[in-house]
Each structure stands twice: as C-alpha cells, then as structure tokens.
C-alpha cells in the first residue's frame, strides 16, 4: 500500500526537459542498508515470540460505555443539593442553570425501540413516546379488540416511591376511552390538567362531560364545580358496571405551552390544592397531563417533590429530581426557562416555610 502511494506521488511530479548540450549525470548509488534483526531493533537479545492461538482470549483493558449506558449512569447519579438558605440567598445564576440543564440527557425513546403495532395513531406527537420500562399497560376492561397501549408512564415521587404519578399526553378523540380506562384501572382519584384545550392549535380534547356522558364502558358525571382565579376544580364520578368512584379534576389554565407562568404563586397554590387528606389517603397514582405530557407536567411533579424535600430535609436536589423524572419518562422539563422557573418557585416555597431551628 505504501509503495503504491509513493509510486503515484512520483508519477505526478513534472518532468524537466534537458537541452541537447547537457548531459545527465549518472544517478548516485544509495548506500547499502544494514539489515538489523528484530531483536536488535527492540534493544533486546530475547527473541520475540507471538503465539497466534492466544489472540482473542485476553480480556480488554477497559470496556467502552455505549451512549445508552452513559445516559443511564448520568440520570441515576447526578445531583446538586441546595439548602434552603442557598436557594434563597445564593442561587445558581441563570447561565449556570442553563448549562446544568443542557447537560441532562433527554432519554427520549427511539421509535424503533417501541415495538407496538399501531401505537402511532395514539400518539399526539410522534417523537414523544412512553419509555418502555415504566409505561402504563391497559388491561382492556372493555371488549374492544385493541392493544394495551396508552402514551403514559408511571412516575416515581418523593424519596423514589413507585407509581406516585402517571404522566400522560392530553387525550385525543380516539384515546378518550383509553384515558378513562386507565383512570379506572389504576384507581385514580385526582387528575391534574395543565393545558387549555386550544392554544393556537388543539392541545387536548374535551374528555369530560358537561353533565353526563359515556366514554366506552365508563359513565362519567359532573357532581360539582368550583372556579378559582387560576384553576377550576370539578368533582366527578366514574361508573363501570355497578361500581362507582369519585374523581377530582383540576384544570390549571394559567400556564402557556413551552413557557412559564408569570409568577410562582399560582403553581404553589395548585400544589397546596393537591395536598389534601383525601389525596394522601388514596393509594392510586395522581394523573398529570398537559399536551405532550413532559413540559408543564414535569414542572408540576418536580415542584411537588421539591416542596416535599424542602419540608422534610431542609434542602432540595432539583437536578436529581429532573434526572429521576427523565428516567421514567423522557424529556420531562422541556426548556431551560422551565428549569430556572422551578428553582425560583422552590425558593419562594422555602421562604414560606417556618424558620429553621438550630440543631
């Protein structure tokens, strides 16, 4: 190979035309090379012996981590605890928070890895898919011949408790019955909705009745409604066959898509609305959704977990919270602006807590 390349290089050099009265001197002879044995070149008199039979049997010096392994390692180990005092008086700068946020792997699902026929027709956004290891599988309470698929994931809560939340997309016309089946199957007593039905374009269909309506085999009734400045609370009943259950539905409308609320107060009041004895007594997960089920949904869940950490420990690990959320559902917390707003909201909550007592 080397000789062939050298041959091409010489062939490409321009030739020099010599005059008739000039004679070309004979080429100088290159000095003879002294052949050196391999042992001498290596500076050793010990013969080099290579047993080709041993090739391939030696363990590699180090293993190479795949991008997937690197992602999982980061999401499982990263953290940045902040005390109440630091969060209020010496918080990271917006630039530092942006840099920290951009280092967090999104952990989105590759569509090729989701081997579920026909799932695309039930996805509001083709690139936002449920992570397989934590996705909710429908048990098919009705006789409809369909898959167990719904674009939803179980999400861990404070202290890593399993299945505290279900994060899901805003229901579509062809997934409303699936949504209510999930509510029934998981014994859900609280739904938090963080989007309006339309924000320029459709973000979510009107999946609850004005008074009473059937969605598949589930009969939904409105029992009462109360409007607050930033959100509306509806008390529903869901009936399947002869069994009837109560469900609380909260529609928080003061949050534009891909942005943040004008102030943190309304979000903290929403969290307080959720912190009721009824919520604590119910064993089922809280269903949280916006349009895609990752941005505003992630912010609400992270805020509630962060408030619980501050109240119980006197510090909060917002980076660790977001990493835990993204392990369960890729892309939770969509923008650096939302990440910064999360810090601002939790700093406000920390300021509202009773003064810390000296140990």
Swiss-Prot record:
Residues that the record marks as modified (Phosphothreonine) are: 66
Q: Which residues carry this modification: Cysteine sulfenic acid (-SOH)?
A: 290
Query: What are the start and end residues of every segment in region (Interaction with MAP kinases)?
Result: 38-51
Region spans: Disordered: 1-34
- Kindly state which keywords UniProt assigns to this record, in alphabetical order: Cytoplasm, Cytoskeleton, Hydrolase, Oxidation, Phosphoprotein, Protein phosphatase
Regulation of its activity: Inhibited in cells after FCER1A triggering.
Q: Record-annotated residues binding substrate?
A: 257, 290-296, 334
Reproduce the UniProt comment on modification after translation. Answer: Oxidized at active site cysteine. Treatment with pervanadate (vanadate and H(2)O(2)) or with antigen enhanced oxidation of active site cysteine.
Q: Which residues carry this modification: Phosphoserine?
A: 44, 93, 143
Pfam families given in the database record: Y_phosphatase
Supply the InterPro entries for this chain: Prot-tyrosine_phosphatase-like, PTP_cat, Tyr_Pase_AS, Tyr_Pase_cat, Tyr_Pase_dom, Tyr_Pase_KIM-con
**Gene Ontology cellular component terms for the protein in this record:** cytoplasm; cytoplasmic side of plasma membrane; cytoskeleton; cytosol
**Record-annotated Tyrosine-protein phosphatase domain positions:** 97-349
Q: What's its top-level EC category?
A: hydrolase
Similarity comment? Belongs to the protein-tyrosine phosphatase family. Non-receptor class subfamily.
Question: What is the protein name stated in its UniProt record?
Answer: Tyrosine-protein phosphatase non-receptor type 7
Recorded name of the encoding gene: Ptpn7
